[in-house]
From Swiss-Prot:
Disordered: annotated segments: 55-74
Domain of life of the native organism: Bacteria
Source organism (scientific name): Listeria innocua serovar 6a (strain ATCC BAA-680 / CLIP 11262)
Protein name: Uncharacterized protein Lin1265/Lin1734
């Protein structure tokens, strides 16, 4: 799974090979593999403008065949 986040100040962040995603009312936490090692991430949801999830199990597909499920916060 790939997660993409947009911050309220316009920054875009992409995380590949994501696992162990947990979301509650205030935060999202997950692990991803970057530069050959597993790393953990915590984001405060109020700091995010939006996010997108790429997942092979998603119902909507983009033009290139990738499956995306978009969630916007705001």
């Amino acid at each position: 799974m790939t997660l993409i986040f947009w911050t309220k100040n316009g920054q875009e962040m992409e995380f590949d090979l994501v696992e162990n995603v947990e979301i509650d009312e205030k935060i999202i936490t997950f692990d991803y593999y970057g530069e050959g090692e597993k790393r953990g991430v915590v984001f405060i949801l109020n700091n995010l403008a939006g996010m997108a999830v790429e997942d092979e199990n998603s119902e909507s597909e983009s033009k290139d065949g990738a499956s995306w499920f978009k969630v916007y916060r705001g």
